[in-house]
């Protein structure tokens, strides 16, 4: 766009062809209002100011900047992995509308059921090595899957009855292995194989007994953390008791991830201290 404006300010016959090509490209990609689109997207996704240093951004802010850049590039196929992570309710509402109006194809992985309901037109379920498509949103998928599971249960019951009959025939018939009976035996083998394929695998998670916790679990005293002039946490003091379950809430960029990173030792506070009890073993997913 800047190059086109430059050519128009210094228009000549020599630059006419280049100007025409640029105009066609700008028209096809709807770039005339690009700057306004960028501002609107950054505001909707609550991105930090455009001149902010990336090194000073929180994890949530970096993710929103990356999402903003991806959406504005408008690829033919948009692949999104948990797009609602680090987004608040208003931002998710904007993203839902943006994706419903998106000119290309969108494929996403998400555990946000409400987001799936409001955006998707197809659901692809991966089940025991198969991909099963369903037309409709998540609610429609649940209804269709329930019907499919009922049908599969009827088919499984019918298959088991057929297997039982064939087992009785094989055991009782002295002529079961004659040439004319081999086709029936093959059919029996096929039924058994189909039943094995339908049988879900067993999964087991073993959680060992934890050591006894001491009096100190996690304690913070006068914890302070800043990035440049931006203060995220100031003089924070708390004690987490044994067995306590705490939800950390706050707007994007408030310092939630930074607090966790200080607890796990991935970042150090500017002042104050975090103490993790000697008997405490931390487990986390970043």
Curated annotation (Swiss-Prot):
Domain ABC transporter: 21-85
PROSITE patterns: ABC_TRANSPORTER_1 (PS00211)
Native species: Rhizobium radiobacter
The protein's role, per its UniProt record: The induction of virG by growth under acidic conditions and by phosphate starvation, in the absence of plant inducers, is influenced by ChvD.
Superkingdom of this protein's organism: Bacteria
GO biological process, one term: negative regulation of translational elongation
Membership in a protein family: Belongs to the ABC transporter superfamily.
Gene name tied to this protein: chvD
Protein name as annotated: ATP-binding protein ChvD
Lineage: Bacteria, Pseudomonadati, Pseudomonadota, Alphaproteobacteria, Hyphomicrobiales
GO molecular function: ATP binding; ATP hydrolysis activity
UniProt entry keywords in alphabetical sequence: ATP-binding, Crown gall tumor, Nucleotide-binding, Transport
Pfam families xrefs: ABC_tran (PF00005), ABC_tran_Xtn (PF12848)
């Amino acid at each position: 766009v800047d190059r086109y404006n430059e050519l128009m300010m210094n228009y000549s016959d020599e630059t006419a062809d280049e100007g025409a090509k640029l105009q066609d490209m700008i028209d096809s990609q709807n770039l005339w209002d690009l700057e306004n689109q960028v501002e609107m997207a950054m505001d909707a996704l609550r991105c930090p100011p455009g001149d902010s240093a990336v090194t000073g951004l929180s994890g949530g802010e970096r993710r929103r900047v990356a999402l903003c850049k991806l959406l504005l590039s408008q690829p033919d196929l948009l692949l999104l992995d948990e797009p609602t992570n680090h987004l608040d309710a208003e931002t998710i509402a904007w993203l839902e509308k943006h994706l419903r109006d998106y000119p290309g194809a969108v494929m996403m992985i998400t555990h946000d059921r409400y987001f799936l309901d409001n955006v998707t037109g197809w659901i692809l379920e991966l089940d025991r090595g198969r991909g099963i498509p369903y037309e409709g949103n998540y609610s429609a998928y649940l209804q269709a899957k329930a019907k499919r599971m009922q049908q599969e249960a009827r088919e499984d019951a019918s298959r088991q009855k057929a297997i039982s009959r064939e087992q009785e025939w094989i055991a009782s018939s002295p002529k079961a292995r004659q040439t004319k009976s081999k086709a029936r035996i093959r059919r029996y083998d096929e039924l058994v194989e189909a039943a094995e394929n339908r049988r879900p695998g067993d999964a087991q998670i073993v959680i060992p007994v934890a050591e006894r916790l001491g009096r100190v679990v996690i304690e913070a005293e006068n914890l302070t953390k800043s990035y440049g002039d931006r203060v995220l946490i100031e003089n924070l003091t708390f004690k987490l008791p044994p067995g306590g379950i705490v939800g950390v809430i706050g707007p994007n960029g408030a310092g939630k991830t930074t607090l966790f990173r200080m607890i796990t030792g991935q970042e150090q506070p500017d002042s104050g201290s975090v103490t993790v009890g000697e008997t405490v073993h931390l487990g986390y997913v970043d």
